[in-house]
Swiss-Prot record:
It is found in: Cytoplasm. This is Ribonuclease 3. The gene is rnc. It comes from Bacillus licheniformis (strain ATCC 14580 / DSM 13 / JCM 2505 / CCUG 7422 / NBRC 12200 / NCIMB 9375 / NCTC 10341 / NRRL NRS-1264 / Gibson 46). The active site is at D66, E138. Its cofactor is Mg(2+).
Amino acid sequence: MSKHSHFRDKKMFQKKAEQFKKFQERISVQFQNEKLLYQAFTHSSYVNEHRKKPYEDNERLEFLGDAVLELTISQFLYAKYPAMSEGDLTKLRAAIVCEPSLVSLAHELSFGELVLLGKGEEMTGGRKRPALLADVFEAFIGALYLDQGLEAVVTFLKAYVFPKIDDGAFSHVMDFKSQLQEFVQRDGRGILEYKILQEKGPAHNREFEANVSLKGEVLGVGSGRSKKEAEQHAAQEALAKLQKHHMKQ
């Protein structure tokens, strides 16, 4: 099937082709088989309204993309957090690939503008529907995998997803104090000590600063709206420092 045959008419083809061209330039990805790219953004409602045309919706690509996304995220987390338990790795991965996270990524990359929808779905606001956008993101990952392989998917995720993990966007599901404790105990390094360094701000907007030390050496410092949050951030910094040192050995 040609690229042109995926659209209703020549005018629509030219408009969409230009949109997809700019999209690929923006994300620094060039599909070898653009039919896969178009399919990733084709909703079943569009196919149902054009049964006489050989259109394919994105549902099979979504199925594949879901598995590819879980694999690549799992590989990244396994390498990045050597002290994290299987249970915590699973929770973190779930937070990264859950619908709200994928919708946020889809919005960030303007996926909604490219989706091909049936008239009925369009009229009922389907273009902004969270589940639809999450599905399109997974379908895009599946299409990229088929077009260029796992390495291309990892390169894309390095640009748009992995930095968010590094920046702590999903830290709300992570218990850094427990991870740090496990890391230290595993190597028999000693006992961790947490200390609240200061409290500042009015009672309704208090901020705490804490550090964590091992055998007198400060490993991390953190701040937060509660003592617990400050200690978690201190543990996060300490864990990152110890893991970086561990990986260099």
